[in-house]
Amino acid sequence: MQAKAVTKYVRISPTKVRPVMDLVRGKPVDRALAILRYLPHKAAREIARTIESARANATNNYDMAPDALVVKYIFADEGPAFKRIMPRARGRADRIRKRTTHITVIVDDGEEM
């Protein structure tokens, strides 16, 4: 059985989040959280929050054992970008795109319904 958690509009670029996700994909939830705890990336904190939410959803909504959960799927989709203006020389301006990310985590206990 699977449980899902989504964190939307995280103010980090998806290209910065995806390499951190690769470290925990397919690992047990407890091991994944231990790995993320010692990473210096801002993305690691957001991914850990989402994994903890998926674990809580699994235990509270589906009565799964929290120690048997594995991070089955984890991916980052691009959210809307905030557009900002950066003034440049000679009256010009450049557009700055502040990108956002939607983080999705699906945990599984390996049992069929």
UniProtKB/Swiss-Prot annotation:
Keyword Transmembrane helix recorded: no
Source organism superkingdom: Bacteria
Annotated Gene3D superfamilies: Ribosomal protein L22/L17
GO molecular function, one term: rRNA binding
Keyword set includes rRNA-binding: yes
Keywords: Ribonucleoprotein, Ribosomal protein, RNA-binding, rRNA-binding
An example Gene Ontology CC term for this record: cytosolic large ribosomal subunit
PROSITE patterns: RIBOSOMAL_L22
GO BP, sorted A to Z: translation
PANTHER family: CHLOROPLAST 50S RIBOSOMAL PROTEIN L22-RELATED (PTHR13501), LARGE RIBOSOMAL SUBUNIT PROTEIN UL22M (PTHR13501:SF8)
Quaternary assembly: Part of the 50S ribosomal subunit.
Role, per record: This protein binds specifically to 23S rRNA; its binding is stimulated by other ribosomal proteins, e.g. L4, L17, and L20. It is important during the early stages of 50S assembly. It makes multiple contacts with different domains of the 23S rRNA in the assembled 50S subunit and ribosome. The globular domain of the protein is located near the polypeptide exit tunnel on the outside of the subunit, while an extended beta-hairpin is found that lines the wall of the exit tunnel in the center of the 70S ribosome.
Protein's name in the database: Large ribosomal subunit protein uL22
Source species of the chain: Roseiflexus castenholzii (strain DSM 13941 / HLO8)
Gene: rplV
